A protein has these predicted regions:
Chain A
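Short amphipathic alpha-helical "recognition" segments used for binding
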Residues: 6-7, 22
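Positively charged n-region of N-terminal signal peptides that target proteins for export
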Residues: 1-4
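Exported/periplasmic ABC-transporter solute-binding proteins
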Residues: 20-277
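Bacterial N-terminal signal peptides
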Residues: 8-16
């Protein structure tokens, strides 16, 4: 008798959980996969969409490469990427009958940041490359105080790392002593707490706790990034399989950045809207 | 060795052993206390009127009337502050004032046309207006206080002229008056500095009280409300009252931080009384009071965890673990029963035992890899990361724990029980089901609960097999749908879900916004720890009851 | 029924008390029962064998996905790959010419594990000694739940603690240039390995039995001497098993090292400098897996790292199994 009661209780709990979970009717669904940099914009767009249209949007932030792979495998509708497709990825996509179309929704600048107490105000691209390759080890060589440089980089699988690697380091390998962090907020936290640290983060992470350096004489601002004048500016992409069908949810999502609301979300998240120049 | 030395060593050893246990208890406290301290502030905190506004608008909680009254009170208290700010802003932003002057001049031309003034008078009036406009612009653009004031006086001298009555030019005189007020008090040359500082002050006011009246609604929910908690309000207040600058301490030395009081920055200007007003009246402006936000465990998050709670994550974790148990419990208990009761003592069984122990030792990330390679990639019926794949992976993780605990529990059942049952004529299977298993039930239950808590806390196996950072709560349809179409239940299992364990990781290293709300980060981790702790304490209680039952004391 | 007993058919045994049928039926009489009994046992064996199936499948899939990394055509390139994997310290999978040198990762895993054991083993053994021999029963009842709670805290909570609380503390109070380093990871791993070490070594010491202890006391030894010179050596196999199980736990831990170790793929130089960041195998798999496209070289390389991890923990498991069987023998009164 007691056993039957316990069993019945379990069944009721299970049914209850599931009906709490899915009491709604079938909604239109959208699946996004990809970069952790574009992720916050995707999140905010998704939230605005859910409020307006009542659809269901799933956002996975596992990395640019995985997002593109998911698009090729057909597991997602939109891939978010902070870099363009690599040639092998493009070839694999075409081989699988997927023809990726890029939508640029915002621009981002990779800013080199240091602790606010660091007297150094600007560096050249070559100097930054030397720091990350281990050739410059102390701030006094650059006109700062006598402190060892703690170089911090995003880990090798991130799109931000790839852009930095390509444009600043010119594809050379980093020094073995460089510390790797998983994501932008960690890099920001490390610089905030360590006086001798140098790192690179997206534009949206600049605040009063860190100081951005001028690179080659140009300060990363909305204008310089949108014009491409700043050394490490990059577009942020959404990739779809072919141009999305007009009027579909995917299409609405991909052109959302053109609306006023989309632009203000992009700016509020700390990125540069395309029309900033 | 001398006896005293040996006794001393003995005492020292005992002391060291006792100290080590104390250290371990200390470690537990050091780990748990900060988590709970900061995590509980997500549930118990001092809220402000902004929080109540948020709750009303997103979840429709709270008494409408009382809230309205309160909102009116705070608005009344805030109005003077907004007025001071608006006055000063109007007077400082010379670029927009120049634009307005030009606008007014154009409008005046239209006004004259509208009133059909004869042509020569028209040209005359327009020329005079142009003069006034140019003087005004000269006043706005000059850096020299004397020139500014002289030009403003010239403009304002024209105020009495009757031809300008009821015309748009009146507005120009109002602007001139306001700018005169500002120009008398500030150092005109440092206008741009005042402008930058004013922008920081305005941002701080927005952080405290929400968007300024008359501004468009910002797109992100986090900007649509002011400070919802008193601790965040205190931070914004600090930014309002103090500015910080990094000044040089000498060549080759790091810069040092200097705090500059904003009262000094704006000393003598119209903005100065604002700071005192805000600081002294903060209670009336925000109406703080204590709140127990227990809905934290039910609500969904708003704006990347800036507001809201962890409800769907808890639901996701529960779904994953319960489904994992559905797979693991039958397999585990039956395997344990077989191993104890039926298994012969040959090398096949030794192999099985060895495999079970191996399973217990596999690292959790390798489970994740296996789950990815097998459940997601190889089994095409599943094909993508989803609840089903993640639960299957978790069930394999939980299996060895259940088997071990059940085996021990079944072994502990005294042989006399079995002998008595057999003597009464029951077969071996009957004995197992009706006598042994119920007697071993507390131990088996303990094992189940322990594996449940392990499955709830694991992140690595579910990373690639079915968990997402943001997504809808999985839709299983309603019971009526299941009757019509049983396949829809399976469809529900093919969706990914959020989970507490992955959410804690994501929020710790993820969005920038999470860094602004540490109470949310700690709150999620605390929820996970609470869940696991409750399960474990239940297991401990059951086990102590069981030991009483089986031992008889 | 007694009347029926008197009328039993020829061939059936006569029971003392009459039953309607004999107690033990031959297969020919009760085919259904016979078959179902054996079928049932077979089914139960198969169900139990799912664990075996699971282990075999795990090994199969991990090996299957690692082979394409080594076998790219010729045996020579395969051997070169193996050499690069185990001897090269550069892990640059997304460079233009990718290098998959996992030496730094392997050394990193071992580094934090040994660091964790250095802290956890003395602490754990002392606590085990205290709980098995010195503590009164009531204190033991209190300490057991404490240790179980320590074991139950999820690893992501420990990782969170390491990043948010321990790392800033290390930076401010010990003056390290970075708070997420090998020392941070070792400390947390030690805390995670402690419960295993304490419980297994306590079991081993209790299994020794009272006789050895009483003999030692009878000869006039103090408690410390008994523990150090008699009990610990007698339980050495169990204690070694405890250490190995703790090591298995530490090496297999993912979330804590991913968040707290700094993820710098290099070998600390000088080797005793624990304030430098390192990267472990588990953190590499967890961190890189999200970015790698399926069935690319990087994907296979990550599975190879997983295979290394699996082989390592499996061998540790086998050794500790063997050692634990020794305490089984002790318990039953052997040796």
């Amino acid at each position: 008798m007691k056993k039957i009661l316990i069993l019945a209780m379990f069944v009721v709990v299970a049914v209850g959980l599931m009906s709490v979970a899915g009491a709604a009717e079938e909604k239109k669904a959208l699946q996004l996969d990809g970069s952790t940099t574009v992720g916050p914009v995707g999140d905010a767009f998704a939230e605005a969409f859910i409020k307006e249209k009542g659809c269901s949007i799933t956002v996975k932030k596992t990395g640019s490469g995985d997002g593109v792979a998911a698009l090729i495998d057909g597991r997602c509708d939109i891939a978010m990427s902070s870099r363009y497709l690599k040639p092998e990825e493009y070839k694999r996509a075409v081989d699988a009958n997927v023809f990726p179309v890029a939508h640029v929704i915002a621009m981002d600048g990779v800013c080199v940041i240091v602790h606010p107490s660091n007297p150094v105000k600007e560096l050249t691209g070559a100097q930054v490359a030397d720091i990350y390759m281990g050739k410059i080890k102390n701030w006094k060589e650059l006109g700062g105080s006598d402190m060892p440089i703690v170089a911090i980089s995003r880990d090798t699988s991130s799109g931000t790392y790839e852009v930095f690697h390509e444009k600043v380091l010119k594809k050379q390998n980093m020094d073995a002593a460089v510390e790797y962090v998983n994501a932008n907020p960690q890099a920001h936290a490390r610089v905030k707490s360590t006086a001798g640290a140098i790192a690179y983060v997206g534009l949206g992470f600049l605040d009063s706790n860190v100081k951005a350096l001028k690179i080659d004489g140009i300060m990363p601002t909305r204008q310089t990034i949108a014009q491409g004048a700043y050394l490490v500016s990059r577009p942020l992409f959404l990739f779809t399989n072919g141009y999305p069908k007009l009027g579909s949810l995917t299409h609405a999502f991909c052109i959302f950045y053109l609306t006023e609301e989309g632009q203000s979300i992009v700016e509020a998240k700390g990125f540069v809207s395309l029309t900033s120049y | 060795m001398r006896l005293i030395l040996r006794q001393f060593l003995d005492k020292a050893f005992t002391l060291a052993a006792a100290v080590s246990v104390l250290i371990i208890v200390g470690i537990l406290l050091v780990v748990l206390v900060p988590m709970f301290q900061k995590g509980l502030s997500a549930v118990f905190f001092t809220e402000t009127i902004e929080f109540r506004k948020l709750q009303k608008e997103t979840h429709n909680r709270g008494n409408d009337e009382a809230l309205q009254r309160r909102i009116e009170q705070t608005n009344a208290a805030r109005k003077p502050i907004y007025d001071v700010l608006a006055d000063f802003s109007l007077g400082i932003n010379t670029e927009s004032l120049v634009k307005e002057a030009k606008d007014i001049y154009q409008k005046y031309g239209e006004y004259l046309n509208y009133h059909n003034i004869p042509k020569d008078q028209y040209t005359e009036y327009r020329k005079q207006a142009k003069d006034i406009r140019d003087t005004m612009i000269a006043a706005l653009e000059s850096d020299n206080k004397d020139i500014v004031l002289a030009n403003l006086d010239k403009v304002l001298a024209q105020e009495e002229n009757p031809i300008y009555k009821d015309s748009p030019v009146q507005k120009l005189f109002i602007l001139a008056l306001q700018y005169q007020k500002t120009a008398r008090t500030i150092d005109v040359a440092k206008r741009s500095e005042y402008l930058t500082n004013l922008q920081e002050v305005t941002t701080a006011i927005r952080q405290l009280f929400g968007p300024l009246p008359g501004e468009a609604l910002p797109p992100l929910p986090m900007d649509q409300y002011g400070a919802t908690r008193m601790d965040m309000a205190q931070k914004a207040l600090h930014i309002l009252l103090w500015d910080e600058a990094w000044v040089s301490d000498g060549d080759g030395k790091p810069l040092v931080k200097k705090n500059i009081s904003r009262r000094e920055q704006f000393a003598g200007t119209a903005l100065e009384p604002l700071f005192d007003q805000v600081e002294k009246n903060i209670d009336v402006l925000l109406m703080p009071q204590f709140r127990c936000y227990w809905q934290y465990f039910i609500d969904d998050w708003v704006n990347s965890h800036y507001f809201g709670g962890v409800g769907p994550e808890i639901l996701g974790t529960l779904m994953l673990t319960i489904l994992a148990m559905v797979f693991a419990i039958p397999l585990g208990v039956i395997s344990a029963a077989y191993l104890v009761e039926y298994a012969p003592d040959n090398h096949w069984i030794k192999l099985v035992r060895m495999c079970i122990n191996t399973l217990a030792g596999v690292p959790s990330i390798v489970y994740g890899l296996f789950g990815l390679a097998f459940f997601v990639v190889t089994i095409h019926a599943i094909g993508k990361p989803c609840i089903l794949a993640a639960s299957l992976t978790l069930s394999i993780l939980a299996l060895p724990v259940i088997i071990r605990a059940s085996e021990e529990a079944i072994r502990l059942v005294p042989q006399t029980y079995r002998e008595a049952s057999l003597a009464l004529g029951a077969g071996k299977f009957r004995t197992l089901v009706n006598v042994v298993l119920p007697a071993a039930a507390p131990g088996i239950l303990t094992g189940i609960i322990l594996s449940l808590s392990r499955a709830a806390g694991e992140t690595a196996p579910i990373l690639f097999t079915g968990v997402v950072a943001m997504g809808p709560i999985p839709n299983f349809g309603s019971p009526s749908e299941w009757i019509r179409n049983p396949g829809s239940l399976f469809g529900g299992l093919l969706q990914p879900t959020r989970a507490l364990s992955y959410g804690s990781y994501d929020i710790a290293v993820g969005d920038r916004i999470s860094m602004l709300v540490p109470h949310q980060q700690f709150g999620m981790v605390m929820t996970l720890i609470l869940l696991v702790l409750i399960l474990n304490i239940a297991a401990i209680v059951i086990r102590s009851k069981m030991s009483k039952k089986l031992r008889g004391y | 029924m007694a009347e029926n007993a008197a009328q039993t058919s020829v061939g059936q045994k006569k029971a003392a008390v009459g039953f309607s049928r004999s107690l033990l039926l031959t297969p020919s009489e009760d085919l259904v029962g016979f078959l179902s009994g054996h079928l049932g046992r077979a089914i139960l064996f198969c169900i139990t064998a799912t664990s075996v199936a699971a282990v075999l499948l795990i090994f199969y899939f991990v090996i299957r996905e690692s082979i394409p990394f080594f076998y790219t055509g010729t045996a020579a390139s395969g051997i070169a790959r193996v050499k690069e994997f185990f001897l090269d310290t550069g892990w640059y999978p997304s460079a233009t010419v990718p290098r998959y040198g996992a030496l730094a990762l392997i050394v990193g895993s071992l580094y934090v594990t040994i660091g964790a054991l250095v802290i956890a083993v003395p602490l754990g053994l002392l606590a085990g000694v205290y709980l098995s021999d010195i503590a009164p029963f009531s204190l033991r009842q209190i300490c057991k739940p404490v240790i179980e709670i320590l074991a139950a805290i999820p690893s992501v909570a420990y990782g969170f603690f390491a990043v948010m609380v321990l790392a800033p503390w290390l930076q401010t109070h010990l003056g390290f240039s970075t708070g997420t380093n090998a020392m941070n990871a070792s400390l947390i791993l030690a805390v995670m390995a402690l419960p295993t070490i304490i419980s297994v070594s306590e079991d081993a010491m209790s299994a020794i039995g009272r006789e050895i202890r009483e003999a030692s006391y009878g000869l006039g030894a103090t408690r410390a001497e008994t523990m150090i010179k008699v009990v610990l050596p007698a339980a050495h196999s169990g204690i070694l098993a405890a250490v190995l199980l703790g090591m298995m736990r530490a090496i297999g831990e993912t979330m804590v090292v991913w968040m707290a170790s700094g993820n710098a793929s290099r070998i600390p130089s000088p080797w005793w400098d624990v304030s430098q960041s390192i990267r472990t195998m588990t953190a590499t798999i967890a961190g890189d897996m999200g970015e790698t496209p399926k069935n690319s070289e990087h994907y296979y390389a990550l599975f190879t790292v997983g295979l290394t991890l699996l082989v390592f923990t499996f061998s540790l498991n086998l050794i500790s199994e063997y050692l634990l069987s020794q305490i089984m023998r002790n318990k039953r009164g052997g040796k």
